Amino acid sequence: TSNGVQADSGVVDADVLHSLQLTRAFGENDPLKIIGAAKVKELVWHEDAFAIGFNFGLLTSLVKLDMSVEKASGYRNGSFMASTNGMLLLEEVNMRNNRLARNGDNGNVATLDLSWQGRLKKLDVRGTGLTRVKLATGAPVVQLCLPDTIEELFLEYLTKLSDSGLILEGINNVRGYRYTNCPGIDGFAMLERLHQARLNGSGKLERFVLEIDREDDGTLLKKYYDYGTYTQTGAVDDRHSGLRGKLTLTKYLADEELEKYAARYPELTIKQPPYTMIEFDDSVADDANVSNLDNKTGYKFGNTYKMSGHVNAILSKRHRVLAKVTRMPTSRKVEIAGQQVEVNNPDGEMTYFPLHDESSNFYADAEDMNDCTVAKLDGSEGDWMMYEPFYWSKGINDYLNNKKYACYSSYPEDEMPPIPDATVLTLDAIKETQGGWLGERKIMSGKPTLMESYTTDKAYSVCKVDVSGYRRVRFPSVPGTGLIGSVFADAEGNILKSIVVPTIGLKFEAGMYLIADVPERATALHFSILNTAEFDCVVLSHSDKIEDMEPDWVANEEHLCAVVGSSVVGSKLRACITGASTTASMTWTDFHYYSQQRGMQQIDALMHSRIANLSYAKYGRRDMQEQCGAGQHNNNRTTGGTAEHGMTDTIGYEEASSINPNVTNSLIENSVHQYAWYREKDDYGGATVTQVNNICCLGYEDIYGHKYDMMDGVDLPNDTGNSGKWRIWMPDGSTRLVKGSVSSGIWITAVAHGKYMDVIPVGSVSGSSSTNYCDIYYISTASGRVVYRGNHGAYPYGGVSMSNASYGSSNTSTYIGSRLAFRGRLVRASSAVAFKAISEVA
């Protein structure tokens, strides 16, 4: 000691502990000195009452320090080391229950600073009363034991520390929490514990920092909104909260709510969910079998359906416009329905300017309609069209579970929503695998082994795919006539599971796909295909999300489609108000020709499906005649009855009569009420209705009923092996075939749907005017059929889903019309004045 007492001396062997006896050898004013301290590797000293002046900084070779005591004595409030900067080799420190576990400020602050100990592996300071522990950035700590008095829990860059190595006496005093790059620690789970303690009234958490990359429905943003955080320099910041990194929402948030959270979490990238998902429950006949999985409304949830998210974003971009062809497209020869016709390429151009959403009689060049420029809808200022924006979509059929799904994304064209991981196999790829394809065979279900399941049939083939290790598989199939189907087999060829599409209640066509869970021990799926059916692909997935069984997204291109049917004005077909009704009694060939000469086309099959699907997604039902009304029961309605109401949709009898029980009650075929109504307000703000002859659905006038719309870009060749198949021309000029029903006159109960969400009736089951799709499908299997859509008059079978493929291209009728459309380059004029000054070229 400083007073000359030599307690012990001698030569100590390396790596061998030597005991020093210091009983009554030093006092408070007699600091202890260890001669040769720089050579000490391990020090075990179960003492908490030594002199303040002991200089641990001399122990420069110390690797392990054990100064734990069984019970804290509370003898002194000093610190066990005045300086730790020289103890750079320290790896293990055990100060459990030792109240001297402090450094700096003579121990008056309950802080232990080990920020110089870059090799520290183990630290135990339980029972020490510490409120803060500082560790070296990147220290290889594998065990960290902290007291229940800790107020600042900072877990940063401790890459070796695991959950099992972090031992906390308690968390109720933690006021500040920081977590960064500790892969073995569940930092989010710790935050949840701290938050729950505060909710329970036992915790004191005030601020935190946590880097995340996770999915959430917005609950986290609300939960941690009121907490503070720390700046990058470590300063307290109570104006913002501490979530950082990336949060992908699973529920779409309104723009104003998103802005609020973005301001509170400035270092958190909040990504709206990539899509909104709609579910159709085909096990029920209710036309309103639709559920919005985004906001949990609709049939499945037993409440009123409300559109939201990406559907709302897509619909908000749609507007009525006036448009002019400003560059003629080139064209090519195409045979449609047996006729050689000129078809425009998508290299033309139309320039447009929006009309006010509250009234199409004004341009949308000011918010207040009183300040807007008057628009002329007589054709002198362009064609009256609907601007249909770009969006992403995909459909999923889960036939075996009686479900269909529709996914919508308003992401821009240059940002495709995430593509799920999946193995996709084409028929060619399957044929290239050993035993992958066996011609002139089919699988019969219900047999015990694979070999017993094969039967010869020239119309079919059997495909085999390896399903080992996968969770789900999607594969094309056939109706189960005679128990034909598919089987899962194990490595020995034993049948583990058979799948058959029942022919009773059939809502399926050959080539449509099934989705099935892969049974345990299954190594292969053997499935029957019809040789003349379209083969989409096989999808193998590890995902539990049904939407991941369709890995491809469809880019729905922006285009224009006429708000009203076509009218002859002079020598041209126009979309305009003439004071009379729309044009009829022309052949498909002539309607196509005059539309093409304008640099445009007729409405096509993709547009037909798009309008139907968006109406389902908007209203959560499929019976648009009840939703938006059926209109006047004739085919000679005066065009333009919806102009002064802009994009506002009409309502049907059910809603109108709930406002005014005295509205016209006129049933057509004892099924549907004719006319439509606008919901308005009287002078006192009360609800009232106004009856009109035209319907408005999705902003379109008479998009169903009144007159059929002939369609471009589709026919039914009905040649060998292709009976009932719709041939659809895609915008890039390619074609695809979709098998539809061959049962004419059925009330539609199912549609092809699939990736493109085709509203093409399938199966043989018939519904009614008030169930399922509430519309009828007509078809002829004679060669070269064109397709009409929407029906005529106000017949109960003629809604937004209705189509008619019974006639050839030469048929005419007073109840068959057309509707202009345009695919190509769209240019928005800089102003209404600039638009009016533009001259059309066709």
Set out the residue ranges of the language-model regions:
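A structural signal for leucine-rich repeat
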Residues: 56-57, 80-87, 105-107, 111-117, ...
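GGW-centered surface loops in extracellular recognition modules
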Residues: 1, 273-387, 393-395, 600, ...
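C-terminal, surface-exposed recognition/capping segments
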Residues: 609, 630-675, 679, 687, ...
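Extracellular polysaccharide-targeting segments
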Residues: 426-456, 466-467, 498-499, 507-549
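Short aromatic-cysteine micro-motif
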Residues: 375-383, 413-423, 547-703, 842
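Extracellular ligand-binding interfaces
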Residues: 2-7, 479-513
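Concave beta-strand-loop units of leucine-rich repeat
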Residues: 45-51, 66-76, 95-108, 119, ...
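LRR N-terminal entry segment and analogous cap-like coil->beta motifs
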Residues: 11-112
